[in-house]
Curated annotation (Swiss-Prot):
Region Disordered: start-end pairs: 207-241
InterPro entries: MukE_C, MukE_N, Scp_MukE
Keywords, alphabetical: Cell cycle, Cell division, Chromosome partition, Cytoplasm, DNA condensation
Name of the protein in question: Chromosome partition protein MukE
Function noted in UniProt: Involved in chromosome condensation, segregation and cell cycle progression. May participate in facilitating chromosome segregation by condensation DNA from both sides of a centrally located replisome during cell division. Probably acts via its interaction with MukB and MukF.
Subunit structure: Interacts, and probably forms a ternary complex, with MukF and MukB. The complex formation is stimulated by calcium or magnesium.
Bias (Acidic residues): 227-241
GO biological process: cell division; chromosome condensation; chromosome segregation; DNA replication
Family from the record: Belongs to the MukE family.
Transmembrane spans: none
Gene3D superfamilies to which the protein is assigned, alphabetical: 1.10.10.2250, MukE-like family, C-terminal domain
GO cellular component: a single term: cytoplasm
Principal location: cytoplasm
Gene name, Swiss-Prot/TrEMBL: mukE
């Protein structure tokens, strides 16, 4: 029996699956979470068994990717047997802003700590406020209520990205303070080779904002699978709980 299993499952893969860290790491990856070096044990586990686990996940038509910045995540193919991870247009835009902030001088000045309010303010500063408001309400008049709704959607987007391992809460859960992980570079692949990374990311934000207000407002129909998102990132444009 054991000999037959060894023929079917390579020894190192069997060791990976038997590792006590595997169930939690597997669950996180399948939910769309990104695992970076800040997760010491989980990251070391993935680094040690990267090739074996990639072979394991390919049976489900997904790939275990290690990005140039070091973090791990699963990228599904069109025929994936694992539920696809998706993001709305607005969540992708907020992700681009987070990447922009990660590259900013303020990150060092503020010891890497940002707030949801800063994300909201930066989004309004970099993108067209009127288009963003119309994404919340097509008949937006720029009222305080419309701005409040937009702020709520931005906060929800930040929380979604937190669950995906893009940011990490600082202090109390509801403090609104967080640090930004390198995994936000999923939203800025183009900046890896740009002469000026921050300017390149600014272009990505403006390109994303340049999408029609209709595409931003139709969040339910605007979601894309993770593989499509990766293609858009590579082209210079831009998961499930």
């Amino acid at each position: 029996m054991n000999e037959n299993l060894q023929e079917l499952i390579p020894t190192k893969l069997a060791a990976a699956i038997a590792n006590p860290l595997f169930p939690a790491v597997d669950s996180q990856l399948r939910s769309g979470r990104h695992i970076g070096q800040e997760y010491l044990d989980n990251f070391a586990f993935l680094a040690d068994f990267q090739n074996e686990l990639d072979m394991f996940y390919r049976r489900y038509n997904v790939e275990l990717i290690r990005a140039p910045e070091g973090f791990f995540y699963l990228r599904p193919k069109a025929t994936t047997l694992i539920a696809r991870s998706v993001l709305s247009e607005l969540e992708m835009l907020v992700g681009k802003v987070l990447c922009y902030l990660y590259l900013s001088p303020e990150r060092l000045a503020q010891q890497g700590i940002f707030s949801v309010q800063e994300v909201y303010d930066e989004l309004l500063n970099l993108a067209d406020e009127s288009k963003l408001l119309k994404a919340v309400n097509q008949r937006s008049s720029g009222s305080d209520l419309d701005k409040q709704k937009l702020a709520e959607k931005v906060r929800a987007a930040v929380n979604r990205l937190r669950r995906l391992g893009m940011i990490h809460t600082v202090g109390e859960q509801n403090s609104g303070k967080f640090t930004i992980s390198e995994s936000v570079f999923r939203f800025g692949a183009e900046v890896r080779s740009g002469d000026d990374p921050r300017e390149a990311q600014l272009r990505l934000i403006r390109d994303g904002e340049a999408a029609t207000p209709d595409s931003l407002s139709q969040e339910k129909s605007a979601v894309k699978n993770d593989e499509e998102i990766e293609d858009e990132l590579d082209e210079g444009l831009g998961e499930e709980e």
